A protein has these predicted regions:
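Membrane-embedded alpha-helices of multi-pass transport/permease systems
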Residues: 78-83, 125-154, 185-194, 241-242
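Hydrophobic alpha-helical transmembrane segments of polytopic membrane proteins
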Residues: 208-246
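Periplasmic/extracellular loop-to-transmembrane helix junction in inner-membrane transport proteins
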Residues: 7-10, 33-75
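Transmembrane alpha-helices
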Residues: 128, 132, 165-198, 230-233, ...
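Short cytoplasmic-facing helical segments at TM-TM junctions of multi-pass membrane proteins
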Residues: 141-180
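Transmembrane alpha-helical segments of polytopic membrane transport and secretion proteins
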Residues: 1-22, 240-259
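Generic hydrophobic transmembrane alpha-helix motif, especially the helices
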Residues: 101-137, 145
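Transmembrane-helix boundary motif in ABC transporter permease subunits
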Residues: 72-100
Length: 259
């Protein structure tokens, strides 16, 4: 009984959680199968819809298109945000960069026209709309990380003979790299939530978001669930991949994280 009690006590050390996770997954699947809500398709119906989408609707091709779009937007948003974050450490740039974080309140419907004029085709339009949305949120959190740098850290860098942009590189870029990777990983998930909206606006370019909008238009619930679960699985794999990259570049994270 004592060992079971430890599983519901916060921060209590326990053994492996793999068996517990498998058990919970099995329970959820059973509840899903016996659910009385007929509006929610069961797993077998979703599997049949997934096969139909993959063989007749080109879902895997559309997923690849969306993956390229997301990857491009993540790269551009991360590069822009990191560049602005470095500039933010200089007082002259702080007001304008702080103001840029307010752009996260703008909706895509009101700015699509301008991005249409600035881009050459639908693929570029999707990438830059996503980049805009992701950058606004990523920048807000990145500035919070930079503001968390203490005066003691800055003074310590100065005692080592570092000043100006070199101090910024050591204290902010290298010193907060693991936190920046976590932000990018979280922002990548935000990108998938924005994707359907963007691909719905630029539907002629395709993508899994456009396919989802088409299925939603016809209230094809089996297909909707199949697409959503496909995005969910892909997003989880993407999250693990980004976390793995972070652990490779910042191996000290594993030593400082609570298990």
């Amino acid at each position: 009984v004592g060992s079971l009690k430890s599983y519901v006590v916060p921060f209590e050390p326990v053994g492996s959680l793999k068996i517990l996770a498998i058990g919970q997954a099995i329970i959820l699947l059973v509840l899903w199968f016996i659910s009385p809500y007929k509006l929610i398709p069961n797993p077998l119906e979703i599997l049949q819809a997934w096969e139909m989408l993959a063989t007749t609707q080109g879902m895997l091709v559309e997923l690849w298109k969306s993956s390229v779009t997301i990857a491009s937007a993540i790269f551009y948003a991360s590069a822009i945000t990191l560049g602005l974050g470095v500039l933010y450490t200089a007082p002259a740039f702080k007001p304008i960069i702080r103001w840029m974080t307010s752009l996260r309140f703008l909706g895509f419907a009101g700015i699509t026209f301008f991005f249409t004029l600035w881009t050459s085709d639908g693929a570029a339009l999707k990438i830059w709309l996503l980049t805009f949305g992701m950058t606004a949120f990523l920048l807000t959190n990145m500035l919070a990380i930079i503001d968390s740098v203490t005066q003691e850290e800055i003074d310590y860098a100065k005692t080592l003979g570092l000043s100006g942009w070199r101090a910024t590189f050591e204290v902010v870029v290298r010193g907060r790299m693991d936190e920046a990777f976590d932000l990018i990983r979280q922002n990548a998930a935000i990108g998938w939530t924005l994707l359907s909206m963007v691909e719905g606006l630029v539907r002629y370019e395709g993508g899994i978001g456009a396919l989802l909008m088409n299925m939603s238009k016809h209230l094809n619930l089996d297909a909707i669930f199949a697409i959503q679960l496909t995005i969910l699985v892909y997003g989880i794999l993407q999250d693990y991949a980004l976390r793995w990259i972070r652990n490779i570049i910042c191996p000290y994270v594993a030593l400082t994280s609570a298990r």
